Regions:
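Alpha-helix initiation and N-capping motif
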Residues: 1, 91, 157-158
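Amphipathic alpha-helical coiled-coil/heptad-repeat segments
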Residues: 122-166
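Short, glycine-/Ser/Thr-/acidic-enriched flexible segments
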Residues: 38-39, 64
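Short, solvent-exposed loop/turn elements at domain surfaces
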Residues: 41-43
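Short, surface-exposed loop/turn microsegments at beta-strand edges and helix-strand junctions
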Residues: 21-32, 45-77, 98, 108-114
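Non-catalytic DNA-recognition/assembly elements of restriction-modification systems
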Residues: 1-37
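Hydrophobic aliphatic residues
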Residues: 8-11, 98, 164
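Basic, amphipathic alpha-helical recognition segments used for DNA target recognition
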Residues: 4-6, 64-123
Length: 166
């Protein structure tokens, strides 16, 4: 068992906060993220304060929502913690572990340092972490593919029904 604080570094988001909240829908711009269900709030053309350090987990300190991020971004809220892996820790593994715990809170307080960092988790060796993370990622890819196929079948059915009852 190891404490979460021994697996992850955290960074305050201050230098990555978006200044203009008049977001664009142009996906060629930099996404502005939140850790809650909406995830991408919109896009910004701000060329400063962009998080560009690679993979991270964004953690909402109030709601305890988490998202795995592997692209450039900015954030909207100072309640976001940006988490990165310490040496010999697979970030995706820790993300999946924390996701499995279904963290949530109804209290409007900061949780990461007081509740999450001291939490103990099972941490296998790095090779096993990577194997588990890759396996779970392949399942995510399969789910995404099946969902896209499902949506295509729905569209095909709608097309057939529209042409059947003309």
């Amino acid at each position: 068992m190891v404490q979460v604080k021994d697996t992850l570094n955290y960074e305050q988001p201050t230098k990555y906060l978006v200044t203009n909240t008049d977001y664009s829908s142009d996906i060629s711009l930099i996404p502005v993220l939140t850790a809650n269900k909406s995830f991408v709030l919109g896009y910004t053309d701000e060329e400063f304060g962009i998080y560009d350090k690679g993979q991270s987990i964004i953690f909402d300190d109030f709601t305890m929502d988490i998202k795995f991020v592997d692209f450039l971004f900015k954030v909207k809220s100072s309640a976001i913690k940006i988490l990165t892996a310490k040496p010999n820790v697979n970030l995706k593994f820790v993300f999946e572990y924390l996701s499995f715990l279904n963290l949530s809170s109804n209290e409007h307080k900061r949780h990461y340092i007081s509740e999450i960092e001291p939490m103990e988790i099972q941490l296998p060796n790095y090779i096993q972490q990577t194997y588990v993370a890759d396996f779970l990622s392949s399942i995510d890819d399969k789910i995404k593919t099946e969902f896209e196929f499902h949506m295509l079948l729905i569209k095909q059915k709608q097309y057939l029904l529209a042409n059947l009852f003309i």
